[in-house]
Structures are given as structure tokens and as C-alpha cells.
Amino acid sequence: MFQTTPKQVKPTTVPKTGRKNADVAHEHFTNGTQKLEEALLKFEAILKPKEKDQSIQEFRKQVRAVCKDAKDAKKFLEKYKNIRYRPKRTRESHNTGLEKPRMISEAMATFADWEYGKTEKSRYDVTKYLCAYIKDNDLRDASNKTIILPDAKLKKLLQVDDSVVLKYPTMQKYLKHCFDEVVARAPSPTTELGAAELTDDQTTAEEAPKEVKKSRKPKEVAVPQPPPEEEEVAPVEQQQQSVESEEEELQLPPPKPKKSTGKKDKENIPLEKVKKEHKIKK
């Protein structure tokens, strides 16, 4: 059985983004050019006339090897381009934060021999000067170099107590003593007038009653009503009985009998009854 040895690949070191690394870029460029030269030599060897016994398979192998070298050369040149010609980030403004220049204090001017009242320095410049002073005078702890051991001159400038452990990150808190306090400027008369006008406008706006927005009435939603109940039709006999009962209720009461009074009643008696009564009496 044939034993296949694994292919040994050289590790490629790629620099971090945003940093220049000319050595790595030069290495990628040389590797790319070497691969291109090898590919060209192989291609020229293929084009030269050889023995007639050369098979098609061997020809294909040679062409594949040339293509592989060309691809490797392309990869190396792309890496070189990404490292060498990466676009840089540029900031538009340098007048913010640590880079904004301010007037230094009198204590800082005497400490650094700068002219007081005219020189303006940023926090970055002052920090750089103090770090150089600490390094030159060997004011760092031997075991931990992040700890600063300030001398009397530096203590007076930063106004640090003996109990405080001063470090490079915490030093920024004490740099406020190296600059003059920013005094608020008095407002000009024009600005005062503008402010007065604004206040008058604000008061009038506050006094004016706010318009109450009419709220829209909610739309009346038609509630579905149940269908009317069908009246049950009574049979004919019940209808007749109900009609008779209604008629009885509507009938007038019978007339009262008249009281009999003397002659008038006799006059109204028929003659036949009078004759019969007369015969009976006889």
C-alpha cells in the first residue's frame, strides 16, 4: 500500500486591522511573484515539443499544476494589496476631548516653565509632559510600574494626599489642577434683550388658553336585532269566544223598571186585560 504524507503548509501571519506591517506585506509580494514565475516556467515546458509517447493524462496533470500555481500567486498578491493599500480612517475634528487646547494654570506654568496667561495646552500634551517627567526622574514603583511615586513637586501640582495610590489611569482625575477654570462670560445686552423677548413670548404662550381639540364621536355600530316573534294564530272557536266576551263587556246595563204611578199606568193597560179583570170580579 502506498503511504501518503500530509502536505506541509507554511503559516501565514496577517497583521491586525488598521496597522502597517511592511515586512509581512513584502513577504506576501515575494511569494506571489515566485509562484507566477514557477507557473510561467511550467507553461513554457508544456509548449516545447516532446516525445510522441506523451499521454493526454500527463498533459492534463501539467496544466492543472500550472493553474494551481497561478491561483496561489493570486492569493498572495491579494493579501499584499489588503495590507498595503488599506484605506485609513481620518477624523474631521481634533478640537474635542483630550485634544482641545485650554489655558494652563499658574502652578502648571511654573512646573513646566511655560508662559502663564498665553500658552494653551491640551490634556494630551500635559499628560505626555508629566509621563516624561515621571520616567526621567524614576518615579515609578519597581515591582509594579503602573504605580506612580510622586515627589514633592508633583504632589504640589496634582494636590495628591499621601494616602492615595496614584496610577496612570487615576492621574487624569487630578489634571484639573493643571488648567484654569473656565469662567462663564457675562451675557451681552443684545442677548439679554433676546432673552427678555423670549420670556415675554413664553408668558403669553403660557397665559393663552389651549385649544381643546374636539374628539371624534365613535361610530354607531348597528346592533343586530332579533327577528320579530310570530304571533300564534288561535283557532276559530277561540276567536269567536273572545269576540263574544268583548261584546258582553261592551253591552250597556239594562234599564231600571219604572215605578207605577196612578192614572198613567192604568191608561197604558190594554183593554182586553181590563175586561178580563172585570168579569172575574163579577
From Swiss-Prot:
Residues 262-275 have a biased composition (Basic and acidic residues). It comes from Invertebrate iridescent virus 3. Belongs to the IIV-6 306R family. Residues 97-181 form the SWIB/MDM2 domain. InterPro entries: SWIB_domain, SWIB_MDM2_dom_sf, SWIB_MDM2_domain. Residues 1-21, 199-282 are annotated as: Disordered. The lineage of its organism: Viruses, Varidnaviria, Bamfordvirae, Nucleocytoviricota, Megaviricetes. It comes from the Viruses. Residues 1-16 have a biased composition (Low complexity). This is Putative SWIB domain-containing protein 070L. It holds the Pfam family SWIB. CDD domains: SWIB-MDM2_like (cd10567). Disulfide bonds: none annotated. PANTHER family: SWI/SNF-RELATED MATRIX-ASSOCIATED ACTIN-DEPENDENT REGULATOR OF CHROMATIN SUBFAMILY D.
